[in-house]
Amino acid sequence: MKTEFTLCCFSLVAATSISFSQQGTPSPTPTPSPSPFKTLRSATKEATIVKLEKAVTEAFKNKQTDAFRKYLAPDFSAIDAEGVKDADAEVADMQNTDLSNYSFADMKVTLLSPKTAVATYKVTTQSTSSGHDTSGTYYAATVWNKRSGKWLAVLHTFVKAQ
């Protein structure tokens, strides 16, 4: 009985060794490439965000309060050199700002999820605010969130380039 038990254990160890030794080096699992449809959807979302950035800036430039507000989420915040502002404060700033010209450069849209995107860019302006020249180059970022089928700005930050 002892011999049979020893033989059984030896056979089990040998079979296990052979089984594990036959496994080759695992090959890396290929990373699936994005489907053309998914890439197209991403490109469409990115183009939509770029259009929204331009539209909200035009509404600001033309002091179109209602048009400007329709792009802002109810919980919108803006951050600039003066501090953190809500939508009402941003609209008040719009009324005190004369934006005569602007141009975007290096715009990049990053999709964080199907409903959240971040636009980063450089903008050069010719502008005054409360009578002071504020012209220059700025770095800006906007976080967009899709709510009830509509993209809304939830956060915008704007800092003058040094």
Listing of model-derived features with the role each one plays in the protein:
Residues 60, 72, 123-125, 157-160:
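Short beta-strand segments enriched in hydrophobic/aromatic residues
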Residues 93-134:
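Surface-exposed, charged secondary-structure patches
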